């Protein structure tokens, strides 16, 4: 069973997947930084500085009178839709950035493939060429 496990791990697909997961984890940090540190401040400046909806909520009981979500949750049940809106906006920005990166990578790959000129087909060996000529002559006689 140990040998089977070694063979499974040594296959290229498993190693490629492991590398992809590790790079994906590192890439997530980069994209999160782009969203939090570059995109969100610009959006906040355009919208007047307030782009954090995390304190938007609806109280579900009369006991809830707190102005912040954390305090309101301590007082009773709340419908915290603001956090969801913030996460949804962050996700949309993240998805857009990833889309743009994938599109750029695909464009680069396509240009690299276009630069590679297809190699001309090698001429057939002499015996194949002679057999083709014989075949063509026999077709003409028939």
Curated annotation (Swiss-Prot):
Family matches, as InterPro entries: Mechanosensitive_channel_CS, MS_channel, MSC/AndL, MscL_channel
UniProt KW keywords: Cell inner membrane, Cell membrane, Ion channel, Ion transport, Membrane, Transmembrane, Transmembrane helix, Transport
GO molecular function: mechanosensitive monoatomic ion channel activity
Keyword Ribonucleoprotein: no
Record localization: Cell inner membrane
A cellular-component GO term for this protein: plasma membrane
Transmembrane segments: 14-34, 38-58, 82-102
Membrane-related topology note: Multi-pass membrane protein
Cell membrane keyword on record: yes
SUPFAM superfamilies associated with the record: Gated mechanosensitive channel
Pfam families: MscL (PF01741)
Known partners and oligomeric status: Homopentamer.
HAMAP family in the cross-refs: MscL (MF_00115)
Protein family per UniProt: Belongs to the MscL family.
Function, in words: Channel that opens in response to stretch forces in the membrane lipid bilayer. May participate in the regulation of osmotic pressure changes within the cell.
Protein name: Large-conductance mechanosensitive channel
Upper lineage: Bacteria, Pseudomonadati, Pseudomonadota, Alphaproteobacteria, Hyphomicrobiales
């Amino acid at each position: 069973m140990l040998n089977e496990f070694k063979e499974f791990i040594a296959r290229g697909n498993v190693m490629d997947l492991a590398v992809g997961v590790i790079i994906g984890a590192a890439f997530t940090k980069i994209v999160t930084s782009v969203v939090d540190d570059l995109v969100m401040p610009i959006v906040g400046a355009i919208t007047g500085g307030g782009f954090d909806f995390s304190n938007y909520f609806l109280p579900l009981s009369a006991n809830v009178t707190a102005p912040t979500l954390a305090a309101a949750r301590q007082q009773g049940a709340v419908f915290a839709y603001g956090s969801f809106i913030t996460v949804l906006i962050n996700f949309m920005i993240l998805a857009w950035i990833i889309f743009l990166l994938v599109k750029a990578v695909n464009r680069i790959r396509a240009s690299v493939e276009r630069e590679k000129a297809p190699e001309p087909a090698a001429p057939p060996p002499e015996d194949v060429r002679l057999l083709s000529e014989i075949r063509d002559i026999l077709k003409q006689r028939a």
